[in-house]
Amino acid sequence: MAMIFEVRVGLRDSDAGQADITRCVLVNAGVADSRIIEQYRADRCTLSWYERSRAQADMHARRIRSLKLKGAVVSVAGIKDADWTTRWKKYFKPFNITPDIRVVPLWTKHARIPAGSIPVYLDTTFAFGSGLHATTRMMAGFLRRCRGRRGRFLDIGTGSGLLALIARAYGAQNVYAIDIDPVAVKTAFSNCKANCCAFEYLKSVSFEDFRIKGQFDFVAANLLTQDLIRLQKKLVGAVAPGGYLAVSGIFHDNYPLFSRRFSSRALVRVAVAHEKKWYAVLFRKRAPAVSPLSRQGQVSVE
């Protein structure tokens, strides 16, 4: 039986900032914030997440212990892979991620769907993207804002496939989704089947290695700040003129850096969302200017 490893960090809730410090250290070490479950009980706050490698779990535990946070208790425990789903079900219940999209755990598929809600069925298993995290919710909000603009959609770091499924529900005709984690891609494929749909492209590949053919009407990138800055040229190039680029995963301490470094004359900032110390930004790519000479010879049909 395969094992996964739960890392738990118990903190004093009364010590302001401990949870934020811990999250920031973990995110900077490569743990996606959407994987971290935060619970409060009495005067304690507990952060927990799961790793498939014991060495990786121990490395993160040592990193947190090295912070020497007062009253912090760090532990690593192995659990059977099959037990992960049972544990996760305690935290994951049906909810509306936007006013008209309802995320429904697959194990509650027969639950009543409120009138006016579009269900998106999800089995997160070990992948990211349950929709419970602020970054995912803000991106879903941007998708709703741009709904009805049919075309090609690219989801970078798709995780469970949730944003790609929402894009499809909002009218995207061609959906492309990539993730560097093959486990996430496998989960996204299962979620496609659960929703009786298919993506035009779903593969395990990094964005750096992704060979872009054509441009997209909407590109969603939920990545760390430094990765967004490093990849901005390719991100901007992937967007069709008049199309949208939505980025999130920007921790509030990094937002000033992002604002300075992520800039392109080709982009117009349309909206900024801020929730629970996380930022997301929606850009629109400028359409190329048409010179007076290029207008000569054009025929107008009324």
Where are the model-predicted features located?
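A generic alpha-to-beta junction signature in SAM-dependent methyltransferases
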Residues: 30, 147, 239-241
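Conserved SAM/SAH cofactor-binding pocket of Class I
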Residues: 126, 130-212
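Surface-exposed loop/turn positions
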Residues: 99-101, 151, 243
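S-adenosylmethionine
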Residues: 180-290, 299-302
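Proteins enriched for Cys/Gly/acidic motifs involved in redox and nucleic-acid/cofactor modification
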Residues: 94-134, 140
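Conserved beta-strand segments that form the floor/walls of ligand-binding pockets within enzyme
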Residues: 6, 102, 119-123, 179, ...
